[in-house]
Structures are given as C-alpha cells and as structure tokens.
Amino acid sequence: SSIVGAGAGTVSSDDCTAERLLELGPRPHLRPPSMQDPPPPGETQDHVCKQEGSPCQQDDGSQDGGVIPDLPEDIRRHIHALLPLRDAARAACASHSFLRSWRCHPNLILSHKALGLDGDLISKVDNILKNHSGIGMKKLRLELYGNKVDSFYVDRWIHIAVTAGVEELAIIMPHIPGKEEYNFPCSLLFNGGENSIRYLYIAMCAFRPTAGLGCWTKLTRLLLSNVWIADDELEGLLSNCTAIQHLELKNCSEIVFLKIPLLECLTFLRVSLCINLQVIDSDAPNLSTFCLFGGLVSILFGSDVKNIEVSCLKFGPPNIVRFARTELLSGAPDVERLVITSPNEMESTPMLSSKFLHLKYLHISLIANEAISPAYDYLSLVSFIEASPCLETFIFEVQQPDMKHDSVIGDSSPLRRLPQYRHNNLKSVTIIGFCSAKSLVELACHIIEKATSLERLTLDTSHGCRSPGRRSVDKPDRWYYTVSGSLTAAPPDRCLPMWGRGIEESHRARFAIRKHIEWKVPFGVVFEIIEPCSRCLMPNF
C-alpha cells in the first residue's frame, strides 16, 4: 500500500512511505523529533506505528505540542496545500496533522511530472482519489499522456471529483493510435457538478452531451481540445451554460458551423485549428475578444467585438491581411484592437471606402518561410491606416529569410506619394524587420509626411531584438521559421535569429534609412533605429 491507501486515523509504516507512492529518493527529516506533532487524539504512538524502525516511529516520537500543532487547522492545511504534490506527500509522512490534510488536499494535479514518476501512474492516481476524504477538493487535473487506462477508472475518478464538489476539472486523455477514443460521461457532470464546476478542460476524447441533462449554473470557463463533438451537441451544451465567460475550442474537427447562442456573460472566444470549420455565428451580446487561429471562416457577430486576433501561420492560407480588410469589417465593425498574423501576402491590400471607425491599435505580422511575395505592395497598407481615422498605434512586422522586393538602393526613380490622405490621430509607428524594399521605404515616408500627430517612429532592422534597451515591441507569442523550415515559438527574452542574407539586408536597410527617411523626420518626433545585436545572430540563439 501507499500513503494514500491509509484509512482515516491510522498511519502504518507502509502508509507513511512517500517513496512508495512517488518513487522518490530518501527524504531528509523535515523536523527534529522534538518538534514533531503528536498522533490524533485517542491514538498512541504504539497504536499508530507498530513496526520498529518505521518512518512514523522515527519522526513522530514526541507527545509535546511542538510548532505545527500550535497552528490553527485551516492555516496548517493552507501551508500544506501550497507545497508541490511530491513535497506534500513527504510532509504527510512526517506529521499526523499533515497526513490528515493530505486526505483533504484541495489541489490535485496528477501527472508523471507532478508526482515525479517514471512507472505506473494509473494505480497511484486511483489510490490518491479513492482515499481522498472528499472534503476540500477544489481542483483536479489528470494528465494521462501515454498511459493506457481503462474507462472504468476515469469514470470513477470523475465521479469522486464531482461528488467532492470540485470547482476546477481538467481531464487530458492519452492518444493511443488504433484505440477508440474515450467517451466522456457527460451525465456524471450533471450529478451535482453543475452546481460546483467553474472551470472545465477536456482533451483527447469524445464529448456527447444530450438534451435534458440540465443547466450549468456555475461554469465560467470551458476549454475543449481535440474533442469530438458535433455542431448541435455543442450548441445544446452552450445553451445550458448560462454563466460562461470564456470559451476555447482547439482541434475540434467535427465542428463545421459554430453557433454561439445568446450568452450574456460570454466575453472571450478562441477558436484554433478546427480544420472543418466554415462559419462562426455568435449571438452573445457582450463578446468583446475573439481569437482565430487556423483557416479563414465566415464571421457573423451580433455584438460589438472590441479585440480581434487572427493568426493563420499553421495550416492557414495566405492573404489574411486582405481578408481582414475586405471581409472582417462586416462581421466586427466596432473593433478597437486588431492583431493579424499571415504566412504571406500574394495580393496587395485594396483601397476601399469602408471604415474601421473605432480601430485604435493595429498590429500586422507577415512571418514567411520564404520571401514575402514581391507582388505584395507594402505601401498598400495605407488602406488600413486610411480606413481607421481613430488609429493611434500601428505596428508592422516582417520576417523573411530573404528579400525579393525591388530595393530602393540603386533605383533612381522617385518615391511614390499619396497626397490625398492625412492621418490625424496616429501617434506611434513601429516597423520590425525593416528592409530596403522600395515600397516599404515609401510606406515609412508616407507616414512621416501624413501623420500629423506622430510622436514616435521606430524602425527595427532586426527580426525583433530583445537586448536590454533595444526592444522595439513586446509581443507574448513570437514565432519564427528555422533554417530547416519548421515553425518554432521563441522564448520571450530571446532575439529572433537572423542569418546570411537577412544580416546583409539589415545593412542595406540602414543605408536606405539614412538616405530616404532619417532627414525627413519632423522635429519633436522621437525617432529610433534598432539594429541587430550579437544575440540576433543564428549561432547565438
């Protein structure tokens, strides 16, 4: 048996061996014997630890109060709950009071990593949950990656958690090729869980809610990842989640038409890599933030969405910027913050009469595995700026291993000008990955000439330098393509790598800035040029 196999009020030598539960190395004494707390009332040391040399006999030899028993029970449990799970089990071996709080541990994150296990996880999880008192359980997270587990066990664990009144429940099932996916027991969640669960995360299983299960009165966050659920099943489920505020769907391949019913509390929606999705139709009146990652879809919003992020780097088509300019406005006319990430633009952004009347923040990123198409005219981005009379911040980011556009260097023809436009509210402009492409130089010159309220202009000739004092923009999710062509996430404090022609192009960009831009910057505008540092070089990444 293990520590979690102990019955209430009894601590045997086997029960006190955390190493047997977590397969740890020898543990040091947490406290000297004089500071150990006594066994529970009515139990003697001989009754608790009958075997000579047991860990309990060594650690709990004092009948004096000591330090731990002087603390109120709720404080002692709070201290115990703050420990990592392995350390919490060790502490339970050294103290009867911690053993009692172990059986009421509020936050159970059960995985190979959390428990420090290399071997069997299923039996350990089963012991922990079967012997939990059912009191105080607030969070249960089961990460069962790579483990063969019978659905009987998972059903039992969910039943235990729901009966205990768990508030946060996360079930991540293993993906085993050739094996039928786990069918999540939805009915168990409505056996009391509808009145306690506030957060639900389900991954790698089928989720088939049926009509008549009931209403989820407490659920505020729902995350479904790699879940098999049909359109009507999801719509029916959401109709019963009256308190939901945050909804995320990832890799849900059965969803074709995502219908969001009238959910007054829903403010955040993220949809990622749902490969068959074609339409998102939302009636949620207070939806304010929408994030789309993957392919393009038709968007119909019945609310004033303020924040939109569209990223199609993975498995997405090109021309996302064009899509945002031509089609997004009809679905979200009141957007105030727009972030667009595109793998490439093959067609220039068209000039249209439609307006983003409330847009204040615009961040456009072109992150290509190859060169950005030379057919794309960077100056056409004026279409976005012109359509946004309230725009205050514009960030344009270009990442490409090579530059194929016509360079301004060696080109004797005059720069194009668009005299009919003025941008009265634009205050801050940042261009990352600035190069010598003539149309990009023309865009920078246009902004200098037409942005009458411009306060700061930053031209970063690196791919996003992160050296102290040289950071052009903070962006939590940064992606880049490696030399082998794989898309990789960059650590937030690292410079994105540059190599070969990219480094050479940064020198040409600096020359273009000196010749065509620097001397045009009006007095009073803060003008900053950021060049690659030693950390931007690929070998140092």
Where are these regions (language model features)?
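Plant-skewed but cross-kingdom recognition/interaction modules and surfaces
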Residues: Y153-R156, C205, G214-V305, I372-D377, ...
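Conserved hydrophobic beta-strand positions in leucine-rich repeat
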Residues: L108-S111, K138-E143, E167-I172, R198-I202, ...
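Short amphipathic alpha-helices and their capping/turn residues within compact interaction modules
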Residues: P84, H96-S97, R103, N107, ...
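Extended repeat-based solenoid scaffolds, especially LRR ectodomains
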Residues: V297-P374, A387
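C-terminal capping region of solenoid repeat domains
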Residues: S1-Q58, R322, E392, D402-D411, ...
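Leucine-rich repeat
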Residues: V4-G9, D14-R20, P26-H29, Q36, D74, L82, R90, W102-H105, L115-D126, N131-M137, I160-E168, ...
